[in-house]
Amino acid sequence: TSYHAGLSAKNYLEEVLNLKVFCMYPTQFHRSEKVFNKKTLVIGMSQGGQSLSTVEGLDAATTQGLYTAAVSENPTALVFDHATTKTRIEVGNEKCGAKTKGYAGTTVTLMMMLSEWAIAKGILSEESFEGYKERMFKVIGNMPNIVNAATEWYGRIKDEFLPAKRIIVVGYDGNYADVLEGALKVLETVRQGVTGYDIEE
């Protein structure tokens, strides 16, 4: 879910920062990633904060002499001890296994913290940031309509949907991270065979 949140924030971050953003699993970073620009910031995300793979990724970044930041909902997160800076995901603790607030919360936290950094560095103006925030609030305000439309859609297709033995979630461009996260949530909650694809694949 944290990886998907990074993918979800990526396009916005590249647009605002005018910098290349790479998303990868912490184990891949720890085991094989070489970073040649020592001004690189590596952000380790873990909603629960105790992910040992995220700790290993942050430690690998430190060993390479890179900047590190940790993001977690947990105020006493282990990942906070392995990064230079820490930022809380303010969504509250989710008691169920399928983390839904954490996905949205991590995505927005990344967007906000790096927008503030961009403002401080003179990369992004306050006026532009206000425009982005207005668009975000508009999307959030439209969520009840989306939920209602999705519920109505399910009501129309449930008799065909329930006997399914395999589910495929598709999407594209800025929604691809949502495809991956949606497939994961179906797997975690419905326990049915599910795959997420870019719609062109």
Give the residues covered by each predicted segment:
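A short, well-structured juxtamembrane/interface segment
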Residues: 146-163
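Glycine-rich phosphate-binding loops that contact phosphosugars or nucleotide phosphates
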Residues: 1-138, 172
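A general structural signal for well-ordered alpha-helical packing
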Residues: 140, 154, 179-183
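Short, structured loop/turn "capping" segments at alpha-beta junctions
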Residues: 123-126, 154, 193
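Adenine-nucleotide phosphate-binding core of ATP-dependent small-molecule kinases
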Residues: 138-146
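Acidic catalytic cores of enzymes that act on phosphate-bearing nucleotides/polynucleotides
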Residues: 161-201
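Short gly/ser/thr-rich secondary-structure transition/capping motifs
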Residues: 22-28, 148-152, 196-201
